[in-house]
């Protein structure tokens, strides 16, 4: 079983808490992206980053010029510090939990492609949905093409998606009939329908990863037992492609 999650905008450098094990699988492609980004002016990069203040854009522009993809690396699982990762709390995982996520969890990334938890990375700013026509490609979805799909499904695993639509779109266009891809929905029931709110969903996704790791879950039935934070599985609203979890207040 493989679990996919999105990265986070907020990141840190932490070379002390955990040691990285490998370099990312698609490091050459990352170097290509970095080279393209360095060829852009500040104004051009600011447009790529979109909804980003001038102060933050300048900070990232200056950082970009000195980025070294092979020095001062942080394991991806603790490099990202957004809400999902805070609720995941990988720093308190047991050894078994850390081994579980290394084997089963994959982080999708516009900059790195696909990451194992202990791949060594550095802070960057580039979302999969950002307007980045790298080296003549239309956007990052076009740049990565089928590569991330093939890496994810190379062992024909069941894939549980805890990723946002922005990152799922790097995988779903390439799914074949035999592929098993199941999306998890976390929300509240409003007028008979489950409505998902971004902040609560990020918290639930982090809790789900922690639950899966702590309990060494390898089956769909195990995933359905998730009940952290007041959620319960709704069999009646779920399908073969979607597991729905309702927040019960």
UniProtKB/Swiss-Prot annotation:
Gene Ontology annotations for the cellular component aspect, listed alphabetically: cytosol
Pfam family, one: H2O2_YaaD
Gene Ontology biological process terms, A to Z: response to hydroperoxide
Annotated family: Belongs to the UPF0246 family.
Protein name per Swiss-Prot or TrEMBL: UPF0246 protein Lreu_0493
Originating organism: Limosilactobacillus reuteri (strain DSM 20016) (Lactobacillus reuteri)
